[in-house]
Structures are given as C-alpha cells and as structure tokens.
Amino acid sequence: MKSWVYRILEKEKILSQKNKYSIGILGLAYKENTNSVKNSPTLNLLRKLKNNKITIYDPEAKLKKKIKNCNQINNINFLLKISNVIIVMTPWNEFKKVSKILEKHKKKNIILIDPYRIININIVKNKYIKYFTIGKK
C-alpha cells in the first residue's frame, strides 16, 4: 500500500514540485485504534518525502522524534484547510467525516489519496477533487 501511495505522488508530479503542494497525512499509527507507530507505513512514506512540507494528524499516535519537514498538529480541520494533497494512511473511523469538512471548506484543486476507501466518494466526487483509491480509476 505504501508503494502505491508513493506511485500516485510520482504520477501526479507532486514530488518534483516541492513548493507547490502542501501534503497533509491523516494517520500516523500503524493501524486504527492504537497509538503505536512501530511498523507504521506513514514513517516509511515520510522518509521518501523528505523534500516536501508535510503536516500530520492522528487522533492517538505521536511522532517520537522531530522530523525536519514534518509538523504534527492536533486539529483535523486545520490540516484539511491548509493541505492541497491529502493522504489517508490509517483508516481511523474519524476520517469518514473528511468529505463533509472538505465540502464545507469548498476547497478546490485537491488531490485525495485514500487507499482504504474510507472517504465517501459521492460527496467528494466533483471536478475540484482528484480522488485516488485502490481498485478504482
């Protein structure tokens, strides 16, 4: 899954335009309902995104040490407001409300990468949001 996310970022040329995109990552824990980051796919992805500005939100897990290009925040609304690339890395139940928050902010030109299909595609499916999930084009 983590390599799939990275391939989408490469395909959309997000990695090569480091100042154009603000990347928001939803989920740091290795799975939902835990605060453990051991074997977290997010940490592997962060190592590959060291040239990009990253904001992370997780309701339970915290970064154990500071990572140069990363800022962990405790407000999902703020992350969604400042990010134009949003990646779901842990399928927390709380993230199901992301589509409604994005709709409320009326955000445009968003790239939403959701390997777990936790986001309600019927709400986010519009001309302003480019939605990627495993198994759907």
Please give the residue ranges for each predicted region.
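Structural/interface elements that position substrates and couple domains in central-metabolism enzymes
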Residues: 1-137
